[in-house]
UniProtKB/Swiss-Prot annotation:
GO terms for molecular function: ATP binding; ATP hydrolysis activity. The keyword Nucleotide-binding applies. Signal peptide: none annotated. This is Probable ATP-dependent transporter ycf16. Residues 7-256 form the ABC transporter domain. It comes from Galdieria sulphuraria. PROSITE patterns: ABC_TRANSPORTER_1, ABC_TRANSPORTER_2. Belongs to the ABC transporter superfamily. Ycf16 family. The keyword GTP-binding does not apply.
């Protein structure tokens, strides 16, 4: 069965806004519906920059190339509209939002997407019916909804909150930027199981890009493709076995090829 193309990145060159410093130097990447891609590489290779550029972060300027998502040129869309189109970015360090309950934050995001799609917003009672099954899916209890956004959360709770948002917003493309960072083995297993449950619920139609330094999350969520970035370029693409090679040999052997 041939899968439909979801994301196409063509010859993407990016620099920091208001500077001449290039960070991405000709990225090409194709992600089909239902695929899992992992992007690995040393610090400073451009992995996180790529995720933020896809999401529409204003810190970066696209100088050349295209980002096509569901046949739409993302460069014509704001960061908010990209999210409403179905792109979700989970941050390595989720932000705390003082004074805002998690449930209010989540309902605001959910209703924003409904409005973008010209649908009526849901009231608080209806939203509870929607969010409860999602809580169970990621292993959180109801009290979690009434805590302030990420305030006093453990590392695992912050990451679970991100995965809860991913499920609630029914993301077509989820970009997980070092979601495994700072997690112990139990928390990593919990997060991985939650992600796999979400994929199963979507009938494996959601696509995921996992950005990571380490192989361990890929032991739980097996990617279809692994891409290695170095100095702003994808220099090698392979299957899941490439992660094992990188774990044992590092990146220098690729840089010298």
């Amino acid at each position: 069965m041939k899968h439909k193309s979801l994301l196409q990145i063509k010859n993407l060159h990016v620099k920091l806004a208001n500077t001449e410093e290039y960070i991405l130097n000709g990225i090409n990447l194709n992600v089909n519906q239902g695929e899992i891609h992992a992007i690995m590489g040393p610090n400073g290779s451009g992995k996180s920059t790529l995720s933020k550029v896809i999401a529409g972060h204003s810190l970066y300027k696209v100088v050349k190339g295209e980002i096509i998502f569901q046949d739409q040129n993302l460069l014509n869309y704001t960061i908010e509209d990209r999210a409403n189109l179905g792109i979700f970015l989970a941050f390595q360090y989720p932000l705390e939002i003082a004074g805002v309950n998690n449930i209010d934050f989540l309902r605001l995001a959910y209703n924003s997407k409904l409005k973008f799609n010209q649908r009526n917003p849901v009231d608080p009672l209806k939203f509870l019916e929607i969010v409860y099954p999602k809580l169970k899916l990621v292993g959180l209890d109801e009290s979690f909804l009434y805590r302030k956004v990420n305030e006093g959360f453990s590392g695992g709770e912050k990451k679970k909150n991100e995965i809860l948002q991913m499920s609630l917003l029914d993301a077509k493309l989820a970009i997980l930027d070092e979601t495994d960072s700072g997690l112990d083995i139990d928390a990593l297993q919990d997060i991985s199981n939650a992600i796999k449950s979400i994929l199963k619920m979507s009938q494996f139609k959601q696509s995921i890009i996992i950005i990571t330094h380490y192989q361990r999350i890929l032991n739980y969520i097996q990617p279809d493709y692994i891409h290695v970035m170095y100095k702003g370029k994808i220099i090698k693409t392979g299957d899941a076995s490439l992660a094992n090679q990188l774990e044992s040999q590092g990146y220098e052997w690729l840089a010298s090829e």
